[in-house]
């Protein structure tokens, strides 16, 4: 007789009450990723343009970044999040719309900081496109 499959006892997602935290918006030309953490840096919720249902070139659009930010904010508000500090990184199109979407979802933004890394003449950039 075959053995009955035993239920794995993995770590269950518990509901925490986190009133304030940080939101990291990584916006590249191809995608936008929004991660919301508590003050210690432990991830509470995240969403990307790809996880929000966009594929291909549509992932780099401002609307995709807005949808991802709304999705991440909704899950963070369910955990009790009220105030966030926003860290924006990258050159993508969805930077401003993601910040507006976080504000529109009901989160109070206390600080906006641009943490895009800028090289002091580091690696050679890719060659220019000729279309």
From Swiss-Prot:
PROSITE patterns for this protein: RIBOSOMAL_S11
Any Gene Ontology CC annotation: ribonucleoprotein complex
Region annotation Disordered: where it falls in the sequence: 1-20
The UniProt record lists the keyword Acyltransferase: no
GO biological process, one term: translation
Alphabetical UniProt keywords: Ribonucleoprotein, Ribosomal protein, RNA-binding, rRNA-binding
Organism domain of life: Bacteria
Matching SUPFAM superfamilies: Translational machinery components (SSF53137)
A molecular-function term among this protein's GO annotations: rRNA binding
Compositional bias segments (type: Basic residues): 1-16
Presence of keyword RNA-binding: yes
Family statement: Belongs to the universal ribosomal protein uS11 family.
Subunit structure: Part of the 30S ribosomal subunit. Interacts with proteins S7 and S18. Binds to IF-3.
PANTHER family cross-referenced by the UniProt entry: 40S RIBOSOMAL PROTEIN S14/30S RIBOSOMAL PROTEIN S11
Reported function: Located on the platform of the 30S subunit, it bridges several disparate RNA helices of the 16S rRNA. Forms part of the Shine-Dalgarno cleft in the 70S ribosome.
Name of the protein this chain belongs to: Small ribosomal subunit protein uS11
Protein species of origin: Nostoc punctiforme (strain ATCC 29133 / PCC 73102)
Originating gene: rpsK
């Amino acid at each position: 007789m075959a053995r009955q499959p035993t239920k794995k006892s993995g770590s269950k997602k518990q509901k925490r009450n986190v009133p304030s935290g940080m939101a990291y918006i990584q916006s590249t030309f191809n995608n936008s990723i929004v991660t919301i953490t508590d003050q210690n840096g432990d991830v509470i919720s995240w969403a990307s343009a790809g996880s929000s249902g966009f594929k291909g070139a549509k992932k780099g659009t401002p609307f995709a970044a807005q949808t991802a930010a709304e999705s991440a904010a909704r899950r963070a508000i369910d955990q009790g999040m009220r105030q966030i500090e926003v860290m924006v990184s990258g050159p993508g199109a969805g930077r401003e719309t993601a910040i507006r979407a976080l504000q529109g979802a009901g989160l109070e933004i206390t600080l906006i900081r641009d943490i895009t890394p800028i090289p002091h003449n580091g690696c050679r950039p890719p060659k220019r496109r000729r279309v």
